Amino acid sequence: KRQGMDGAWLYAKYLRPKKKSRLPLVLQFHGYPGAGRSWLEQCSFVGMGFALIAMDCPGQGGFGYDPGGYEGTTVAGHIVAGLDGEPEKMYYVRLYQNIRILCRIVRTLEEIDQTRVFVNGASQGGAQGIACAALNPGLISRAAILYPFLSDFRMVWELHADEIAYEGLRYYSRWFDPAGERTQEWFAKLGYIDTANFAHLVRCPVLFGTGLADEVCPPATQCAVYNQLTCAKKRYLFEGFGHQEIQEFDDLLLDFFCREEAQF
């Protein structure tokens, strides 16, 4: 455990093979509102010679601690946590600051090859992966991103996709802004955590995957992220797949992380 922002405590699993040479590292980010996968599941990368760090998002389903203290409601999830206060006090702003702290810790690990630090994440983990790469361009050298969450909130709203993972938007609007008088205000604040707004800052190559039948993170909102990437990138579209494990993407990311050159 390490201390994070505003009284938070960061918890992460750290696994590495027994090798004397410096190791490539995968930063693994989990989906919403879960936790890092089990030690057994995380061993797949270790068996291939990678070290792995999997951080639990504070205040979600794992051991990371979040002290709360957000202004306003937390009515239905973390998207709206802090939405009534200043943007820097929103839950996801704090989370991305905590990821910055994690990356500072990574830079101190002598056993890690600092030229081969990769990120991997799906859904909320994909959003964190984009933000991590964007905010730490000198550290992250490759990113594998599958159906990223928290992207293009306005489009989510217009598509009436504010259910399941995005349901906080619907409850917040109905209970605290039923006349729509503050809609522009809270969409502006959500812009601070919109994955699409981080994408143009990413400098490393990105492997990107989208399930075309995804009803949780609609493909159109994922396009908003991919289209803003100005780095080397490659997108795979999986017809018939929703918001679920996509084994073909798993195989693609292994090749992406293992090969010497990341160019597509």
Predicted segment positions?
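Acidic catalytic loop of the alpha/beta-hydrolase fold
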Residues: 212-217, 244
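Cap/lid segment of the alpha/beta-hydrolase catalytic domain
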Residues: 37, 43-44, 51-97
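Histidine-bearing beta->alpha loop at or near hydrolase active sites
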Residues: 235-254
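N-terminal cap/lid segment of alpha/beta-hydrolase-fold proteins
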Residues: 1-20
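Gly/Ser-rich "nucleophile elbow"/oxyanion-hole loop immediately N-terminal to the catalytic nucleophile
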Residues: 78-123
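Hydrolase active-site cap/lid region
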Residues: 130-180, 245
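Short beta-strand element of the alpha/beta-hydrolase
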Residues: 12, 22-32, 52
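Short beta-strand/loop motif that positions the catalytic acidic residue
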Residues: 202, 208-210, 214
